[in-house]
Regions:
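Binuclear metal-dependent hydrolase catalytic cores
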Residues: 1-262, 313-316, 324-346
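Cap/insert and terminal regions of metallo-dependent hydrolase folds
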Residues: 260, 267-346
């Protein structure tokens, strides 16, 4: 299993602007300075002025905290693999995917932890671009048989109220998150011209995991070569207002060997009481880490992680979901994540 960091930033973090020149421009300028005799005695000010003539304003973005998890198993897209699962889909998902050379066409499924925009804002992008991609999967191409998706759903709505499961991405979600997700993304997805009854199932093969109506806790097992990873949703409280509460359902990924990777996702507390055993059992923890000057009270703050967290837990934690990169004592944590970082487990 390979986990790649798409973004590490908090919901409202912003990037930075800088003045710069491109590598080709820098090479041309360097050759000009090296070869022309009049440049040999040029002052720093003259060289700086020449650079400024070429410089442009560039933006270094900060992507929201989402992840790509890859399993060595066949994907929906008719290739040998990997199966690519998104852990949350923030509003800047399309840009974050482009940063690692991927698009929605490369994604097989998504897990949604809770309905804040930095975790679901990219659902509309993922849904619409895969729905209107006739080649998203070989099964979809065969099912469409040359028809446009809107025509297929309109003309054959009795037979096909929604596309078949192998023609759309998987959506793994806890039952208590599904309703809020429907309300949040529904208006933006009800946009297939002429087709009645467009809903979340039109776009996704929904798989509810976690506690079922029967009382059973349903898990999902991913093949990973000759091995397997079991994905289980875990409950953590994120926000409590005067009248409502919002939980975030993180995931525990357990390998056949017992090796465990824990994503609590957004949590109100550094180590919620109900997750103590999960933290202790985990071999690696992807840890929510707020660095805001004024703590929000709905994320663990870096000062608490440094001063109050058990050292045995600290050593397991990879920190993310920050505004500014956290300043922590060297060696205290397993690391501070950056976009593009990748780790292979177990």
């Amino acid at each position: 299993m390979k986990i790649t960091v798409l973004g590490v930033s908090s919901a409202f973090a912003t990037g930075t602007y800088t003045d710069a020149i491109t590598v080709p421009q820098a090479c041309e300028l360097a050759k000009k300075i090296a070869r022309a005799s009049e440049w040999k005695e040029a002052s720093d000010e003259v060289i700086a002025a020449e650079v400024n003539k070429l410089s442009q304003r560039y933006y270094a973005p900060q992507w929201q905290s989402n992840f790509l998890i890859e399993f060595d198993m066949p994907g929906k897209r008719g290739k040998g693999g990997p199966y690519r699962l998104l852990l949350d889909a923030g509003a800047d998902l399309r840009h974050a995917l482009k940063g690692i050379g991927l698009t929605s066409a490369d994604i097989d499924g998504v897990y949604i932890s809770h309905p804040h925009s930095d975790h679901i804002g990219g659902i509309e992008y993922l849904a619409l671009t895969t729905l209107f991609n006739p080649f998203y999967t070989p099964a979809k191409k065969e099912w469409l048989a040359g028809q446009l998706i809107a025509d297929k759903l309109f003309l054959e709505q009795e037979m096909w109220p929604t596309p078949p499961p192998n023609a759309k991405p998987d959506l793994f979600i806890h039952a208590k998150v599904l309703g809020p997700l429907r309300r949040a993304v529904g208006p933006g997805l009800d946009t297939v011209q002429g087709v009645p009854d467009v809903r979340l199932e039109t776009y996704f093969n929904i798989q509810i995991i976690g506690k079922q109506e029967s009382g059973e806790t349903k898990k999902h097992v991913f093949q990973d070569g000759e091995e397997h990873w079991k994905m289980t949703p875990i409950f953590a409280m994120h926000v409590i207002s005067s009248s409502e509460e919002m939980a975030s359902y993180g995931i525990s990924l357990e390998h056949d060997s017992g090796y465990n990777v824990l994503f609590p996702t957004d949590t109100q507390h550094m180590m919620p009481p109900q997750l103590v055993s999960h933290y202790r059992r985990a071999n690696r923890i992807y840890m929510d880490c707020e660095t805001a000057k004024f703590p929000s009270g709905v994320h663990p703050h870096v000062t608490d992680l440094v001063n109050r967290m058990d050292p045995d837990i600290q050593k397991k934690c990879l920190l993310y979901h920050y505004d500014q990169c956290p300043e922590v004592p060297e060696g205290m944590f397993a690391g501070i994540l950056k976009p593009g970082d990748a780790h292979t487990y177990p």
